[in-house]
Amino acid sequence: MLKPLENRVVLRVKEEEEKSMGGIVLTSASQEKPQTAEVIAVGEGKTTNHGTLISPLVKVGDTVIFEKFSGTTVKMDGEEFLILKDSDLLAIVE
């Protein structure tokens, strides 16, 4: 399993619908990049210059919305994950 460093999180991106609202099947080039994902792993946080640890606000299992073109995609054990900084997360879905 992946263990993110500092203030990074590992996400499993949720698959988006591959059809338009009119029922037309979209090619991968015309599809919007998904922005919703499940948090799989969370780093310990970032340490400030004064030595204070700032922990990420998300936890494993949270569903989050993230910035569209952020992060690094990684394949592991046949699955695709996204690693990004917690500052690239926009919201937690409740």
Swiss-Prot record:
Q: Which domain of life is it from?
A: Bacteria
Q: CDD domains of this UniProt entry?
A: cpn10
Q: Can you say where in the cell this protein is located?
A: Cytoplasm
Name where it mostly resides.
Answer: cytoplasm
A GO MF label:
protein folding chaperone
Keywords (alphabetical) are: Chaperone, Cytoplasm
User: Under the cellular component aspect of Gene Ontology, which terms does the record hold?
Assistant: cytoplasm
Write out the GO biological process terms.
chaperone cofactor-dependent protein refolding
Is this entry keyworded GTP-binding?
no
One Pfam annotation, family name?
Cpn10
Q: What does this protein do?
A: Together with the chaperonin GroEL, plays an essential role in assisting protein folding. The GroEL-GroES system forms a nano-cage that allows encapsulation of the non-native substrate proteins and provides a physical environment optimized to promote and accelerate protein folding. GroES binds to the apical surface of the GroEL ring, thereby capping the opening of the GroEL channel.
Record note on quaternary structure:
Heptamer of 7 subunits arranged in a ring. Interacts with the chaperonin GroEL.
Recorded family membership: Belongs to the GroES chaperonin family.
Recorded protein name is: Co-chaperonin GroES
Q: Which organism is it from?
A: Lactococcus lactis subsp. cremoris (strain SK11)
Gene (name only): groES
